[in-house]
From Swiss-Prot:
Purpose: Cleaved by the protease thrombin to yield monomers which, together with fibrinogen alpha (FGA) and fibrinogen gamma (FGG), polymerize to form an insoluble fibrin matrix. Fibrin has a major function in hemostasis as one of the primary components of blood clots. In addition, functions during the early stages of wound repair to stabilize the lesion and guide cell migration during re-epithelialization. Was originally thought to be essential for platelet aggregation, based on in vitro studies using anticoagulated blood.
One GO BP: adaptive immune response
Metal-binding in keyword set: no
Taxonomic lineage: Eukaryota, Metazoa, Chordata, Craniata, Vertebrata
GO cellular component, one term: extracellular region
Mod. after translation: Conversion of fibrinogen to fibrin is triggered by thrombin, which cleaves fibrinopeptides A and B from alpha and beta chains, and thus exposes the N-terminal polymerization sites responsible for the formation of the soft clot.
Organism annotation: Equus asinus (Donkey)
Compartments where located: Secreted
Name of protein: Fibrinogen beta chain
Disulfide bridge map: none
Length: 19
């Protein structure tokens, strides 16, 4: 499971990539 977290426009965007 790949966990990516990046901040954009002052908001926190968390995306999960299933492998």
């Amino acid at each position: 499971l790949d966990y990516d977290h990046e901040e954009e426009d002052g908001r926190t965007k968390v995306t999960f990539d299933a492998r």
